[in-house]
Amino acid sequence: YKGKRVRVVFDGIYKNSRIWCNSYHIGKRPYGYTQISYDITDFVQFGAIDNEITVRVCHTDLADSRWFTGSGIYRKAYLVVEEQVHAVWNGVAFNVSRADEQSAAVCADAEIVNELDERVIGTLTASLKLCGSDEESVVFARVPAAMEAHEKKTFYLNGMIGKPKL
């Protein structure tokens, strides 16, 4: 994964968590019901060396939650590997403004960041895939994209999908 961005994601840690990557403190969260994500690229060691993610939880309050009375990592924890030009974490939103049996008008707002030290030019493609389906993704929009080094920009992609599954 050298040359790419590496992110660690926790879908749930309860509560008052502090997180380290290879002894570098990367963040803390005072509560525990929301997903947290940290870019750990600058702390990861590439090659044959093991990496270590450490999570510390401090739950000194007794029975302070009606939903979860335990402590620790209680949902998925995983790594995400991204290209140097990528969507900002949770930075893509889809909207269907009109739909009938024949077609659907689909919009996507995508916040993209260029982590490179150089300008990039390309094409941004938006597609959808029905969850749990073996069908191919349906491309509904393509736009030309140019971004300066370290720029963050929102792109608006609008298109149509024929015969949507309503």
Where are these regions (language model features)?
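A generic structural motif
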Residues: 30-32, 144, 159
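Surface beta-strand/loop "capping" patches
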Residues: 84-117
